[in-house]
Amino acid sequence: MVQQTFTGRKRVRKFFGHIREVAEMPNLIEVQKASYDQFLMVDEPEGGRLDEGLQAVFKSVFPINDFSGTSQLEFVRYEFEAPKYDVDECRQRGMTYAAPLKVTLRLIVFDIDEETAAKSVKDIKEQDVYMGDIPLMTMNGTFVVNGTERVIVSQMHRSPGVFFDHDKGKTHSSGKLLFAARVIPYRGSWLDIEFDAKDIVFARIDRRRKIPVTSLMFALGLDGEEILSTFYKKIIYKRAKSGSNADGWRVPYDPVRFRGYSTLNDLIDADSGKVVLEAGKKLTVRAARQLQEKGLKALRMSDEELVGMYLAEDLVNPKTGEIYAEAGEEITEKSLKALNEHGYKELPLLDIDHVNVGPYIRNTLSADKNLTREDALFDIYRVMRPGEPPTLESAQNMFQSLFFDSERYDLSAVGRVKMNMRLDLDAPDTYRTLRKEDILAVIKTLVDLRDGKGEIDDIDHLGNRRVRSVGELMENQYRVGLLRMERAIKERMSSVDIDTVMPQDLINAKPAAAAVREFFGSSQLSQFMDQTNPLSEITHKRRLSALGPGGLTRERAGFEVRDVHPTHYGRICPIETPEGPNIGLINSLATFARVNKYGFVETPYRKVKDGRVTDEVVYLSAMEEGRYHVAQANLPLDNRGRFTEDLVVCRHAGEVLPVTSDKVDFMDVSPKQLVSVAAALIPFLENDDANRALMGSNMQRQAVPLVRAEAPFVGTGMEGVVARDSGAAIAARRSGIIDQIDATRVVIRATEDLDPTKSGVDIYRLMKYQRSNQSTCINQRPLVKVGDVVKKGDIIADGPSTDLGELALGRNVLVAFMPWNGYNFEDSILLSERIVKEDVFTSIHIEEFEVMARDTKLGPEEITRDIPNVSEEALKNLDEAGIVYIGAEVRAGDILVGKITPKGESPMTPEEKLLRAIFGEKASDVRDTSLRVPPGVQGTIVEVRVFNRHGVDKDERALAIEREEIERLAKDRDDEQAILDRNVYGRLADLLENRQGIAGPKGFKKDTKITRSVIEEYPKSQWWLFASPNDKLMAEIEAMRKQYDESKKGLEQRFLDKVEKLQRGDELPPGVMKMVKVFVAVKRKIQPGDKMAGRHGNKGVVSKIVPIEDMPFLEDGTHADIVLNPLGVPSRMNVGQILETHLGWACAGLGRRIGQAVDAYLASAKQETKPLKETLKKVYGDNETIKSLNDHELVELGRNLSRGVPIATPVFDGAKEADIEQMLELAGMDKSGQSTVYDGRTGDTFDRKVTVGYIYMLKLHHLVDDKIHARSIGPYSLVTQQPLGGKAQFGGQRFGEMEVWALEAYGAAYTLQEMLTVKSDDVAGRTKVYEAIVRGDDTFEAGIPESFNVLVKEMRSLGLNVDLHNSKIGSATPTSEAAE
């Protein structure tokens, strides 16, 4: 049940879920915060920081040695200083919220002995060096960069490690599977090992030319024999003793090796000489085992059966050293004969049978042209650096640096762990480079795959993809910056006199700071935060993108990468992803998912012990989960937590299968752990088609915050969580009592967590009518009254789109599903005028306009009211500084800020000179460049900000704004001071009361009792003078006084700092003297053309707004608010909206009954609450919260419920059909959920009953006002002289090829000619038309379109001279005048 919170008592949701939630849902923006905290590690722990995050970056780059080795620059530690501006100041001033990074460096200078070359330390210097600013994360997981909020999206990429794959038979025409292995490091060169069609194994480094894999092994220091002994077993064939059962070779018998063996000759037992298998038969696995059981020890092989085998060692004459045959050589009849002649009694052969073991490595070895390590190294050098002559040393160094140098190659801890798991190795995860053993293990595993042992990897398995969050992305970026810096430092260390410099002189922090700035400013993963509503903020922070640097590109990403994978369960939402080219590449984290320290996504499960489900929660990654059987959360359990059914359907290794209940290892914690936050907000999600659910999730993020937010009647129980975690609603930081409150701030006197070092007062500033990134309105309003008691975590103020601490994206409206005169054809929506009149779907949008006054070559621009050629009427909204008043109503074309710019001197006519001489300097040398309201905007000025460059005099307006701000700061300081005084002096009086007084203020009698009345005779500041013989008491009072003085001083200091910041000039871009920002609030009522949607992907456009009296109405005279087309449901299969409608209808009915009970209570003389309590009990059953309320709270609750009883129906565990019917019955309504409806215009009943109920509708951010656009004349393109396109450019409508065909088909010749000439790019013609229209004349002539001239110019650029001859028709001689 909802815990007893301050808002939870004001509105109680009836909960339909049956499954008890065991795990707490993690904070929804934890992904961002935890990752960045781990990177920064702001507070240095005892014993220094661990090697991760920023510390690891510094450790990896430092120490830096100079080229000669005489000096070394070491990293000691780093710390952050306090940020210069706080978050709000950064937003207002367009700054970046960042903290300066201070690094302590140590420069060590060595003395080097000339003869012994021994080093001794000559000098050590330590110094703190400023290393640029590092952006800080705000409380809500965002960054403020240049005044705008940005989010760094987490990236999904391929985990480092080793992957085995095949080409699916696409490379070779035969369809043969070519296997390949790829070692992917975190940074460094990729190593590919692959088969070709002839079964030779090759290696590639960084996708370059391939080299035989044996060359790679030579370079690793193996020779031919070692290579063969690594990959193949050795079998000794012994010459049978001549004379016993004819000549031949004796072979030890191994049933595993001989299974599947096809015989050419009879198989003969070497000891008994009996035939064990006739020629031409195949030895089955069973038969092979039986032969061993019968005691078969060895087989006899004839000479010809050895032909085609391979030697395992070089065969050498021990006396002469002559090599008869080399290791890996194939035995031929000729070579066998020679060996027999030399009298070899034993032959070591390779165990290659072409069935279980293939000769791939042996074949590669024989095909390899390189025979020694040197050749192989040279070959690799030539591949990596073609065109450079190799030397042995350079080749060795290059090969060493490719895979074995920690500077150049890093597998990362993840890569090492993955590699160990895949190849069964046990290297520690601190070992981050490749080892010889790793490369050999990869080749072995690959060869085994080719031999049919083992499985290839699934690249889309979440065990093979990991998440890089903010911290890690930032770490990589900062490392890049430091490496750039390192080069510069090395050069500087060599070029300066090292004995006299300090670390400060060696370091230039610009490259590091630039790398950070570049990352936040222009990386693909640093995105402008989607701030339309709280849900869109949260979703943006929980987004996982496969795009971005080091990731995929849209074009390259195939179908498999985008698809839903079984391992997504509980980790990545299968529903929420964009439609369009990014589908499946951008995903959302599931509700309970979290990212572990290795970057793999984990999901929680309940542990099952001995068939009993416990409450112990374990987080598993995709790799770990594959080993277990996991049951669903909605399985029925008995009261002891055992499964009621014997067979349980489980997920195991990507399959779904029924198993007995004792085999189950884990169980899901919640049914909604499968989906993301946005999908978990859709009630009856289980009744919607997945495609529509996807649209529903995506459209909730586009819902515009309305003027009056209203929580949904039918919710899912997630609404409160989203409102709290997004930071839209304000939660109390500590428990306390509300002390003061107004529209802009709430002051709470803390009663718990009282820390003597902090003030006992929390002041919460509310955001009033601020502009969000998407121009929607951010406005917070308090929910508490003075004297209310709140607990830590209670919601004390609602934000945009929240209602009593719950997410409220839209409004509950009365819907009728029926056609209405074709106005809801094709998903159109018909609305009642009530919705416009009562501002149900009205939203406020705040537009920001800015103007800068720069210093130009001709003189400074000026912001002023004195503008040339502008009437007084147009200046009526401006103050004396030329800036618009707050509260002024403005419309398109009005001046917001007057500005004049100096004009270049144009040559004067004699008349002008004369006038200038007579009247002196005239204002003709400036032009009007004022900021005006753009077309399509009209509204009210809500805020003006003026920024001045340092040293520029502030105008009256800027000073007024400054004064206002200082007053506000002073009020904050005084309030905090007053509460501090009240607290401290109250405690002091309590301590002193009834004590023996041995001293006191002037006039206090010694050794008398200190009573409350005595204390209060004196001013508070003198209370500290009282003294008592109790030393312990006096020590406490002294500590209190010290603390009080410090707090007081701190308050004053903070106030002075802020004032100083206000009065200091602003940091403006170069050349800008002054900047003014004006904010205009636009009120947008809903109108035809606006897009609306429900939560089930049921979207539509408003087609008509009908007078209330014309809307269909019910028997009690209630008119429907909205009419939707019933045909929108069946084909789209989003039946959730119908269930929501029925349930909403029941909620409203129950709300009405509770409302009647409240009215009865207020009307009755006795004011008896029993009937109200009984009504509530019928609805809610035995609810703890309701039982605990007093009469006053009960009535408030009843009032809040009278519009409708809110209910929660969680996804996959919500209300069933029976529950809905029961609710309808309880509300005294028809169980069918349908009602008789009358036509508003005729009063007749409609033939059949109509589904009527309450549905939650959203108004989306696609408003017709932002899209509608018209132009008569405007800007033209430079080259073609055609009008520009698009609303932003104030462009025209394109009249394209097909439209031209239409006019041609109608034969509208004159219209067509206008379209192609005077209305487009006939420059002279269009001017003439304009003049003609102004004159009231309607004759004009079309000339030559500019595009013709462009064509002529293009042909000339190709060397074809084209001349255009203008000639009147009928004249004999054409005039040879080219049209230029």
Curated annotation (Swiss-Prot):
**GO CC terms, sorted:** DNA-directed RNA polymerase complex
Q: What is this protein called?
A: DNA-directed RNA polymerase subunit beta
**What's its job?**
DNA-dependent RNA polymerase catalyzes the transcription of DNA into RNA using the four ribonucleoside triphosphates as substrates.
The source's superkingdom equals Bacteria
**UniProt keyword Transferase, yes or no:** yes
UniProt lists the gene as rpoB
Q: Which UniProt keywords apply?
A: DNA-directed RNA polymerase, Nucleotidyltransferase, Transcription, Transferase
Q: What is its EC number?
A: 2.7.7.6
